[in-house]
Amino acid sequence: MWLQQRIKVFPGLLSSSWARRVLAVSGFLVIIYWYIFSGSHYRSFWYSGKQWGVSGACLQAQIVQWKTLAEKGDVVMVSFPGEEIKLQGPAMVGNGQIIVDVGKNNLWVSSLSVLFHLTNYSPLTLFKNVGALAETHATAIFLKEGLIRTIRCLQVEASDSPRDCVTVREDHFAHRSRPHVYVQNIHITNPSDRVVTFDISSQKPLTGETFSTSLEKVQEKQFLLSSGRVSVEDGKIILVVVATKKLASRLQVSPKSEHDETVLSVVYASEPIDPAKLSDTFSKLRENAKKEMFELMHMKTEDLFHEHQQIWSDLIVSGIEMKKITDLHTPSRDTINITLYYMLSCSLAPLVDPALSNEEREKMESFLNYADHCFTGHSSMHAENLWPGSLSGITQLLQLWDLWKLTLQKRGCKSLVSAGAHGLMQGMLLSFGGLQFTENHLQFQSDPHVLHNSYSLRGIHYNKDLINLAVLLDQDEKPFLHVSVKFQDKLVKLYACEAGCLNEPVELTSEVRGHIFPVLITQPLTPLLYISTDLTHLQDLRHTLHLKEILAHEEHMAKQYRGLPFLFWFSVASLITLFHLFLFKLIYNEYCGPGAKPLFRSKV
């Protein structure tokens, strides 16, 4: 009976416009709450199970490790079905000589005297399945391997089992030690009971001047040779020649089998030339491309990839790892990783060029091992234009590359920039941490106000050794410094001391546990850490810094933020007092002043 009475009340409540508005707003807030806090897991299940069907479930099984690698910072997701993940920049591979925009199927070329220019050549070879019922794909950049990987899952027969889907894995990379080589490796797995057919083609440009293509043959080896031109300023042109492995127009993969295909491309571009020199220049480029293509076709794919990965691994020995970010202006881990990847992909690596003379190599290595006066000025950690959260395309990416080189050159790192990709990585590392080489030592001069962030800088070159420096936080959120060394050559003693060098310098060792230094702030402000091979130099620093005081980091920050000034609080207290006096006056005049109304009415 009581329940029936309560139910009868609801129509009356809903008849009120105010009640209907409250109900609508409450429902909207519930939907928003569900979408934010539980939507990602549900959407992942929905996409993988219902909306994407069998091919989606197959893809989930294929890339189950990608998310783990992404959490470690080894992979940057480009596209992933069912998740709101999209790379805020171009999906590209490069080596300083060529750039391949995998997402847009564009080829960019450069030469010694000119920066990158967009060509009208489409470098990707397309493998399209004939008769697939459904297809799902995902793409990611593998930072430690220097490549872009795409996995496609194809449902080719009416089956409810994801295990019957055909899987196509494509790897794209611009070879790091062979600057003219671009590789596209395709691996197809067909677990189904039917033959799977793929049409093989290359995308033709819709507008602009097309590349002319001819069939070349060198000692029973056939490949395609394409040539075209790029117009530049002053009426000159850049001639581009591309040699590509010749493939059949159709591929059939047998049931219960696998197939591997490696598409090799050799790209040569000329310096800007007058059109009158076109014929001679084409002959030279053609011979160079044919020679290198012939050499590549006699190599194993595994050896080619091993060459690339070995050089790329050497480049990323150095790096930046964000452990904890506590403010909005510090770039995220993914932003830092993808920026480093982009800058390396745009830069040549002359140190791995076999044509480099021993004298030039020793000179570049000396720059890399001790970059005197680099990096001067404040840290680049919070420079949002150097660590952008998004890039619109290759053009903006190249502008960022120019800005990084200009910044490093103006901050004392010109010698590092001349060392190519290895030097650029080192310069970016020094700039992020506020590290500077002087005549006798390496100093860490980070702003004390940014030490609430936890991060590590690995692979800092000091002579031929590698130093790892980390800013970490203890249980009370107080920062401290952790330093370790990885000796590369003969043992050379390294010493370090914290700000002021009042304590005896500590000899750095290669022990895994490393060495811990407190964060001390001096007045006047001096570097937080000194590292040197000269023990006497560090011992002398304490007598030459002429400091007024040395405080722990938390004491320094407490002095910087002593709270609001006395005048502010006095003003607030005065306003509160005046308000209450005014309120008291109103009440007094109402009941006690002239013409005041009586508090109680008379009964008569």
UniProtKB/Swiss-Prot annotation:
Subcellular location: Membrane
InterPro entries: K2013-like
Residues spanning the membrane: 564-584
UniProt signal peptide: 1-40
Predominant localisation class: membrane
Membrane topology: Single-pass type I membrane protein
Keywords for the protein's UniProt record, in alphabetical order: Glycoprotein, Membrane, Signal, Transmembrane, Transmembrane helix
Protein's UniProt keywords contain Cell cycle: no
Annotated glycosylation sites: 337
Domain of life: Eukaryota
GO cellular component: membrane
Residue ranges annotated as Cytoplasmic topological domain: 585-604
Name of the featured protein: Uncharacterized protein KIAA2013 homolog
Source species: Xenopus laevis
